[in-house]
């Protein structure tokens, strides 16, 4: 099965990434990706886009040549309280909010601190998807995080990039996360975490983890555009309402 949705990509606006929106659209057409989110790093990262970048994402068209675009952010979890670096009414203008730990913003400390910070971010109501929770630099109480994600309707990401170019040693943690998500009823999503358009929709390694634990694929948010759009609507993102008619032929 091909998965036509990618929730995690970075553009030239994050200056350690190398592609434009146009590049992603071209690759999406080649690969059969029907919906992707542009989610550049939140402003607290040293080379992140300016705050205005996210405010002005509204200028992006909803669909180009049959490919839908979600306007989003990969925010930074900043502290033990689970606060992120994007706020206020501006959050409600975005279609999708990802958040995770990044060393320049929230240096690794200990398992209890990481767990508390991640669970507080989940409970905040501001974050739709927790990115790369399997990062071995940030050990967490996996069962506690998965339970919170299930309770608060937040998805946990199995990050494909973690097995290829960064966060080496993530396999065991990601397998444990997928198992806990299955057992506790949490939602999973695969993210390419593309920093160059060629890797858009690349889920091979993440999918192997999901298949190994027999996680139900009908709960994967990547399974269809409507599956993700329905999830985001339930999360309170009314901004995606104008995308939904464009996928009226889709089966969630």
Curated annotation (Swiss-Prot):
<feature type="binding site">
    <location>
        <position position="41"/>
    </location>
    <ligand>
        <name>Zn(2+) 2</name>
    </ligand>
</feature>
<comment type="similarity">
    <text>Belongs to the PHP family.</text>
</comment>
<dbReference type="GO" id="GO:0016791">
    <property type="term" value="F:phosphatase activity"/>
</dbReference>
<feature type="binding site">
    <location>
        <position position="74"/>
    </location>
    <ligand>
        <name>Zn(2+) 1</name>
    </ligand>
</feature>
<feature type="binding site">
    <location>
        <position position="16"/>
    </location>
    <ligand>
        <name>Zn(2+) 2</name>
    </ligand>
</feature>
<feature type="binding site">
    <location>
        <position position="195"/>
    </location>
    <ligand>
        <name>Zn(2+) 2</name>
    </ligand>
</feature>
<feature type="binding site">
    <location>
        <position position="8"/>
    </location>
    <ligand>
        <name>Zn(2+) 1</name>
    </ligand>
</feature>
<protein>
    <recommendedName>
        <fullName>Probable phosphatase Shewana3_2794</fullName>
        <ecNumber>3.1.3.-</ecNumber>
    </recommendedName>
</protein>
<feature type="binding site">
    <location>
        <position position="102"/>
    </location>
    <ligand>
        <name>Zn(2+) 3</name>
    </ligand>
</feature>
<dbReference type="GO" id="GO:0005829">
    <property type="term" value="C:cytosol"/>
</dbReference>
<dbReference type="GO" id="GO:0008270">
    <property type="term" value="F:zinc ion binding"/>
</dbReference>
<dbReference type="InterPro" id="IPR004013">
    <property type="entry name" value="PHP_dom"/>
</dbReference>
<dbReference type="Pfam" id="PF02811">
    <property type="entry name" value="PHP"/>
</dbReference>
<dbReference type="InterPro" id="IPR003141">
    <property type="entry name" value="Pol/His_phosphatase_N"/>
</dbReference>
<dbReference type="InterPro" id="IPR016195">
    <property type="entry name" value="Pol/histidinol_Pase-like"/>
</dbReference>
<dbReference type="InterPro" id="IPR050243">
    <property type="entry name" value="PHP_phosphatase"/>
</dbReference>
<keyword id="KW-0862">Zinc</keyword>
<feature type="binding site">
    <location>
        <position position="74"/>
    </location>
    <ligand>
        <name>Zn(2+) 3</name>
    </ligand>
</feature>
<feature type="binding site">
    <location>
        <position position="193"/>
    </location>
    <ligand>
        <name>Zn(2+) 1</name>
    </ligand>
</feature>
<keyword id="KW-0378">Hydrolase</keyword>
<dbReference type="GO" id="GO:0071978">
    <property type="term" value="P:bacterial-type flagellum-dependent swarming motility"/>
</dbReference>
<dbReference type="InterPro" id="IPR023710">
    <property type="entry name" value="Phosphatase_YcdX_put"/>
</dbReference>
<feature type="binding site">
    <location>
        <position position="132"/>
    </location>
    <ligand>
        <name>Zn(2+) 3</name>
    </ligand>
</feature>
<feature type="binding site">
    <location>
        <position position="10"/>
    </location>
    <ligand>
        <name>Zn(2+) 1</name>
    </ligand>
</feature>
<keyword id="KW-0479">Metal-binding</keyword>
């Amino acid at each position: 099965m091909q998965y036509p949705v990618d929730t995690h990509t970075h553009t030239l606006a994050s200056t350690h990434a190398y592609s434009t929106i146009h590049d992603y659209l071209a690759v999406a057409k080649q690969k059969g990706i029907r919906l992707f989110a542009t989610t550049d790093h939140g402003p607290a990262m040293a080379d992140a886009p300016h705050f205005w970048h996210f405010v002005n994402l509204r200028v992006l068209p909803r669909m180009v040549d049959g490919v839908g675009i979600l306007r989003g952010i990969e925010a930074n979890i900043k502290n033990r309280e689970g606060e992120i670096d994007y706020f206020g009414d501006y959050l409600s203008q975005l279609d999708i909010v990802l958040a995770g730990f990044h060393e320049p913003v929230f240096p690794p400390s200990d398992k209890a601190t990481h767990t508390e910070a991640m669970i507080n971010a989940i409970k905040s109501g501001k974050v739709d998807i927790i990115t790369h929770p399997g990062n071995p630099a940030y050990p967490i109480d996996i069962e506690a995080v998965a339970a919170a994600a299930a309770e608060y309707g937040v998805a946990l990401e199995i990050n494909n990039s973690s097995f290829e170019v960064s966060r080496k040693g993530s396999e065991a943690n990601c397998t444990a996360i997928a198992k806990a998500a299955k057992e506790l009823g949490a939602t999973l999503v695969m993210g390419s975490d593309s920093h160059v358009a060629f890797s858009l929709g690349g889920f091979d390694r993440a999918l192997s983890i999901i298949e190994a634990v027999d996680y139900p694929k009908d709960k994967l948010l990547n399974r269809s555009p409507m599956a993700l759009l329905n999830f985001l609507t339930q999360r309170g993102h009314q901004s995606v309402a104008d995308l939904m008619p464009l996928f009226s032929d889709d089966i969630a």
